[in-house]
């Protein structure tokens, strides 16, 4: 009898607990159900880890805003080599090289800085708050392997929004840059509170 009453109490508690969950409504025209080919598509993109892209970067935040040309962003697995040119804050050509958890930043005047905290170093040198370690994943249309995430898909079965680590990444446009791969992002807007980072990609290349 006691066991039966305990079971009823637990079941009642579980039902009561479930009724308190607040589900965030989905944006109109979007679903959190991945399309049938998502597993195959994301597998292709995750194995696409030797690449180079070119384009433009724009940052808007309360303290300032600015734009930069992405002369080249080369990714070899976890290792990145990113060259930016901008007149903002007299940056000139700035080079970022590193792996997750380590960065070397070289300014136009040749000064070089290293840090185990990439985001803090980039913010100190340029004034820009960029999610450096996650960008190589987000720019391909994939969540970073560390941290919870949420994916939302549009009516064309493309990834439309990725939410992770306090950022909302909106995939504004996809294009078939490389014949052997699914469509790749051509325009991305990343939002975090009052910060906005926009990347417009003009060229993707696959490297051996």
Swiss-Prot record:
UniProt cross-references to Gene3D superfamilies, sorted A to Z: Lipoprotein localisation LolA/LolB/LppX
Quaternary data: Monomer.
Localization of this protein: Cell outer membrane
S-S pairs: none
S-diacylglycerol cysteine lipid attachment residues: 18
Gene Ontology CC annotations of this record: cell outer membrane
Residue numbers with lipid attached (N-palmitoyl cysteine): 18
Membrane topology type: Lipid-anchor
Any one biological process term the GO annotation gives: protein transport
Function, in words: Plays a critical role in the incorporation of lipoproteins in the outer membrane after they are released by the LolA protein.
Chief site of localization: membrane
Keyword Signal attached: yes
Family: Belongs to the LolB family.
Pfam families membership: LolB
Protein name (database record): Outer-membrane lipoprotein LolB
Keywords of this entry: Cell outer membrane, Chaperone, Lipoprotein, Membrane, Palmitate, Protein transport, Signal, Transport
Keyword Transmembrane in annotation: no
CDD domains xref list: LolB (cd16326)
Signal sequence extent: 1-17
InterPro entries: LolA/LolB/LppX, OM_lipoprot_LolB
NCBIfam families per UniProt: lolB
